[in-house]
């Protein structure tokens, strides 16, 4: 695990959101209470109310934490010195490292927020999912493939998410970064073809071998 991939939990709000994620993972959404969140976060009820409002607002904000981190990763790794696909390949590595370092938040995004959340909270998961699909679909702009079927991004992302959920439910968070080369290949090949996808998968593999990853 890379320490700099751990999301911060220093302010009262950050501690409350991490506590929300950890408790949600442990007891489910229906088991969340403001008192339990405050106890786990080490904050007073007044601090929780000022920082988060109520339990549903805290749950919504907790899912937004890792999604915002993903957006930051994609933005940080964009560079005019490399192709969009290369930036995406590096982003996949970084995102998987983030997921491994933040298991409670990862569980929310890939399991709880998808299946066990009220509509307002589930909508956050859906918006994050749509962002990733749209990101992949942008690869068509640089594709040389003649056949460009619809919903390709959705299919590619769905396949990767199924593998991620399997590893999460088995408690194998530490294995997630090692999946990066396969995920890069699976995400890129429908858009860019096998040869380019293999090159990008190798880029992801080489990035994984760097300590720390950039």
Question: Which stretches of residues belong to each language-model region?
Answer:
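C-terminal peripheral helix-coil segments that are non-catalytic and often amphipathic
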Residues: 1, 134, 138, 169-214
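Generic hydrophobic, amphipathic alpha-helix propensity
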Residues: 9-20, 37, 58, 62-70
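Amphipathic alpha-helical segments that line or abut small-molecule/effector binding pockets
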Residues: 18, 85-100, 154, 158, ...
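Helix-turn-helix
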Residues: 23-61
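Hydrophobic alpha-helical connector segments
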Residues: 57, 61, 72-104
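Short, structured motif recognition centered on aromatic/hydrophobic residues
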Residues: 70-71, 108-109, 160
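Amphipathic alpha-helical segments used for helix-helix packing
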Residues: 87, 99-119, 133-137, 165
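Amphipathic alpha-helical packing segments from all-alpha helical-bundle domains
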Residues: 118-142, 150-162, 177-185
């Amino acid at each position: 695990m890379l320490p700099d991939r751990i999301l911060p939990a220093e302010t009262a709000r950050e501690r409350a959101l991490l506590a929300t994620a950890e408790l949600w993972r442990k007891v489910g959404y229906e088991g969340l209470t403001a008192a339990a969140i405050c106890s786990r976060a080490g904050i007073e009820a007044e601090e929780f109310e000022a920082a988060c409002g109520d339990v549903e607002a805290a749950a919504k904000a907790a899912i937004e934490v890792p999604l915002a981190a993903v957006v930051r990763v994609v933005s940080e790794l964009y560079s005019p010195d490399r192709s969009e696909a290369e930036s995406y390949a590096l982003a996949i590595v970084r995102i998987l490292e983030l997921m491994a370092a933040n298991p409670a938040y990862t569980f929310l995004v890939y399991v709880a927020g998808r299946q066990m959340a009220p509509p307002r909270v589930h909508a956050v998961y859906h918006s994050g999912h749509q962002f990733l699909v749209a990101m992949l679909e942008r690869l068509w702009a640089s594709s040389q493939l003649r056949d460009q079927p619809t919903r390709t991004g959705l299919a590619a992302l769905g396949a990767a998410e199924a593998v991620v959920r399997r590893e999460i439910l088995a408690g194998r968070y530490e294995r997630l970064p090692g999946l990066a080369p396969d995920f890069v290949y699976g995400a890129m090949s429908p858009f860019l073809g096998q040869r380019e996808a293999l090159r990008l998968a190798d880029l992801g593999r080489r990035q994984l071998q760097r300590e720390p990853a950039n």
